[in-house]
Amino acid sequence: MIFYLIALSTFAYVLSKTFPAIYLNEKKNAIEQGKQLLTENEEVGRFPVLAIVMFTMPVLIFFLSENMLLSSFCFILSVVAYTDLSARWIPDFTIYLLLAVAMLSLRTTDLILSFWAVLFYLMPALLFSAYGYVLKKEKWIASGDYYIFPAIGLMITPEYAASLMLINLLLVLLFSRWVKKIPLVTVAYFTFTGCQTCILLGII
């Protein structure tokens, strides 16, 4: 009880000291994003064939696994991936749904493994972002993507986590030679569902 009280008191003190800087930084980011929206091309992409492929993948996952939570996660992720591809926009409620489904899929015995999976999945992206910021003073990964990555990390095992993110980054770098601004979340959707399909088929 005393430890709990000390921990919460420490958190309250640290938050009171750091919150102004956090708020001002978020406010600055919101203003910058607003300016980008004002100058952004209003055309929204339409990809009907790709949409059909993306939205039928959860059906395949369910057919192979009979796991409704996994299939539901894939469906919500397909919505996120398509909206990011089409308009570079991710609805907030889909982020919450992804996290909720990912948390529901956890078992108590998997908590430590899930923590490592999230960490391994995030690490290559964080290193890539840090490299871009230090050398180019540029954001190479959209900040909104980091709201999606933990949910994906919770749905995979540690042995595949880092390699999946590395594949995501390599594919983005490869395809960006021909197509500008490849959305990383869309690529992550295909690698995640591809990995799940291979696992369910016994390929890996």
Q: Which role does the model predict for each range below?
A:
Residues 1-204:
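A membrane-topology feature that recognizes alpha-helical transmembrane segments
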